[in-house]
UniProtKB/Swiss-Prot annotation:
GO molecular function: rRNA binding; structural constituent of ribosome
Organism placement in taxonomy: Archaea, Methanobacteriati, Methanobacteriota, Methanomada group, Methanococci
InterPro entries, A to Z: Ribosomal_uS4, Ribosomal_uS4_arc, Ribosomal_uS4_CS, Ribosomal_uS4_euk/arc, Ribosomal_uS4_N, S4_RNA-bd, S4_RNA-bd_sf
Signal peptide: none
CDD domains attached to this UniProt entry: S4
Source organism of this protein record: Methanococcus maripaludis (strain C6 / ATCC BAA-1332)
Described function: One of the primary rRNA binding proteins, it binds directly to 16S rRNA where it nucleates assembly of the body of the 30S subunit.
Claim: Lipoprotein is one of the keywords in the record: no
GO biological process: ribosomal small subunit biogenesis; translation
Keyword vocabulary terms for this entry: Ribonucleoprotein, Ribosomal protein, RNA-binding, rRNA-binding
One GO cellular component term: small ribosomal subunit
Region (Disordered): 158-178
SMART domains xref list: Ribosomal_S4, S4
Protein name, entry field: Small ribosomal subunit protein uS4
HAMAP family according to UniProt: Ribosomal_uS4_A
Amino acid sequence: MGDPRRLGKKYDTPNHPWIGERIQKEREISQKYGLVNKKELWKMETQLRNYRRQARKLISDTTTQGGKEAVQLFNVLKRYAILVEQEPTLDHVLSLDIESILERRLQTIVYRKGLAKTAKQARQFIVHGHIAVNGKRVTAPAYLVSVAENDAIEYVPNSPMASENHPERTAAVSEENQ
């Protein structure tokens, strides 16, 4: 029939490819959060850039529609716990950094909860299908976890990792279940 539509890129690359300071910062963030390549980091940076761009647009928009859009933006950011203030303002959105989004990735949360020993191991568990969110297997490490799903992250019941005495399971999880 027809050709499938061409999907656009979900990220913007840096303007200049060889800035040593930026490369060093990206390397540190990639190691801290277990990112495989820079494209993953650039996707999250682009998402943050879009939130900040929307906030800048809404600062100048004083109509009722602008107020509604600001509330919708706050609700999205609160749903994913990217914005944690009780009474958020657009200045809070402008002050967000890349780590506030990276902390909400499934890979990071699995590591922080103690389901994996390292961030890279958390990624492997997710990709291999050992992690479930709300009882559904999720195989995307970049999946943004909402606040409602935060407590529903666990091993898939029929996974070998669900066994208490699996050698790769962390001691923190084994003690928690006893």
